[in-house]
Each structure stands twice: as structure tokens, then as C-alpha cells.
């Protein structure tokens, strides 16, 4: 079976079930132009709760395997590690049934489940969002300069047994053995300093 180096793998997931002639799955976003995330999806946008950006990125998945039942996503900031000590979770979602996610779909949240982002982390103390509010998109606000954000989408062969408010580790554990393909897209967002 041909392996596609541009496609990410997830620990514990099944091997890709693609034919050698099938094109790899891809993800694109109208909210990321020339590798830069448009300002309205982060701290410089106008949609926020308690100062936390809430307007979610749109995206489109193409060439998903025919066996795909649902999709899952992660939007992560690995550049947050030097600041916080861990990768910042901006958005996790599962059981998406359509390959197109419109702009600000997280606000409605219908037709899929969303997990807790890092804006609900206990170390934020009184500034932390409650689990309900943090179970959505929480946009970019890099405090130490420009960060790179990675949106990864996963094509799955099953609906995952998750409810709103799940955690990233629960998503990864539920996806194990069900990932048919994955695709990633990254973009930069300017810092607040």
C-alpha cells in the first residue's frame, strides 16, 4: 500500500485504506490566505466572549475516502509550548457529517460535538471559561509574537462515542483504529505584543 508522506499519522490508528491511484485527502480554508489566518478569527476580530475570540474558521475537505462516515478536527498551537508549557488547544470537534464547515459554525454547534479548548484550562483561574463556553472554538491570541496554528482533519469509519465537553485525549483514544485518512493545513496569526 502506498504511503503519503504529506498526510499525518495518529498513534494507534489503522493503516490508510486508500488505493494507490486515489489522491490524498486535503483540507483548505478561505480564512487562511497565503499562509496567514485572517484577523477576524483571532484576538483582532470583533466576535468574542470575555475577550476570547470565538469566530471559527471555515474549511473544506476534499478527496475523503469513500468509506468515510464522519470527520473529526483539531486546531492546535504548538508555538504555545514555550509560553504555557503545552500545546494550546483552540478547537476540537467530532462527528462532523459534511466535508464543508462554514465560517462561525462553532457558534451554532449543530450537527457535531465539540470538546474543551485550552481557554477552559484550570491554570487560568478566574479567567478560565466554564466547560460549556470552552466547548467550542477559542481563537488565536498569541501573547509573545506570531504563532503558527495547525488545523488537522480526520476521516473516520465510525461515529465516535463522544458528547460536548470531551477532552483532547478522549478524542484521540476514540479515533484509534478508525482513522481512514488525515490532512493538515497551517497558518500564521500575529501576536498581541
Q: Model-derived features: where do they sit?
A:
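N-terminus-centered regions that define maturation/targeting leaders and the start
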Residues: 1-193
Amino acid at each position: 500500500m502506498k504511503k503519503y508522506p504529506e498526510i499525518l499519522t495518529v498513534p494507534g490508528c489503522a493503516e490508510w485504506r486508500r488505493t494507490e491511484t486515489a489522491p490524498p485527502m486535503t483540507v483548505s480554508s478561505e480564512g487562511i490566505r497565503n499562509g496567514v489566518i485572517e484577523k477576524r478569527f483571532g484576538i483582532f476580530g470583533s466576535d468574542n466572549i470575555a475577550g476570547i475570540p470565538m469566530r471559527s474558521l471555515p474549511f473544506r475537505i476534499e478527496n475523503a475516502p469513500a468509506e468515510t462516515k464522519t470527520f473529526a478536527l483539531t486546531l492546535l498551537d504548538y508555538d504555545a509550548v514555550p509560553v504555557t508549557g503545552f500545546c494550546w488547544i483552540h478547537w476540537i470537534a467530532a462527528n462532523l457529517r459534511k466535508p464543508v464547515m462554514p465560517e462561525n459554525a462553532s457558534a451554532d454547534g449543530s450537527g457535531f460535538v465539540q470538546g474543551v479548548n485550552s481557554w477552559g484550562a484550570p491554570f487560568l483561574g478566574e479567567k478560565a471559561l466554564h466547560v460549556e463556553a470552552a466547548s467550542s472554538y477559542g481563537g488565536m491570541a498569541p501573547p509573545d509574537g506570531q504563532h503558527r496554528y495547525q488545523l488537522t482533519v480526520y476521516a473516520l469509519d465510525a461515529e465516535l462515542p463522544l458528547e460536548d465537553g470531551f477532552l483532547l485525549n478522549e478524542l484521540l483514544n476514540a479515533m484509534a483504529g478508525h482513522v481512514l485518512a488525515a490532512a493538515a493545513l497551517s497558518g500564521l496569526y500575529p501576536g498581541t505584543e
